[in-house]
Amino acid sequence: MAIYHLEAKVVSRGSGRSAVAASAYLSCTNILNDYDGVRHDFTRKKGLVWQEVFLPEFAPPEWKDRGVLWNAVEKNEKTKDSRLAREFVPALPIELTPAQWQELLTDFIQNSFVAEGMCADVAIHDPHPPGHNPHAHIMLTVRPLDEQGNWQYKTEKEYLCVRNGEERGFTAAEFKVAQAD
């Protein structure tokens, strides 16, 4: 029987994390972080089943290399407490085969995130013993890309207000103006 589990995290410099380090961990690779000069080596980590970088069609092709992608993200974010990535860790059903896990994740990521302009770095882990705890790591860029391949603004909060039975969505700036009225 499939057991549901989903963990959602933010990779942020403010919490002492690095997008390059998180990507090296999930892909069991060795990546140099150009931002701080630290090399993150997780090549001895076991249990990697599959890994892939998904890009929108207008992203630079060199970003297929996860080291280049996440170093570009680190370079673009300037502040010491920048949010660098979103990470999701879903459990995978043991009733499915690894090929079915890949198909499930590929469809979900392409339709939910890449179609919205985000880059996704994905890996499936099945630690020892196999079939004991299969799960995926999905890292997403916080900023989507526009059609020219430029970073857009980070997602803006939208507030839903109900007044006299009428619902209306507001961005933070619109909400401040509406409050003044």
Predicted feature locations:
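N-terminal nicking endonuclease/strand-transfer module with a His-rich metal-binding environment
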Residues: 1-181
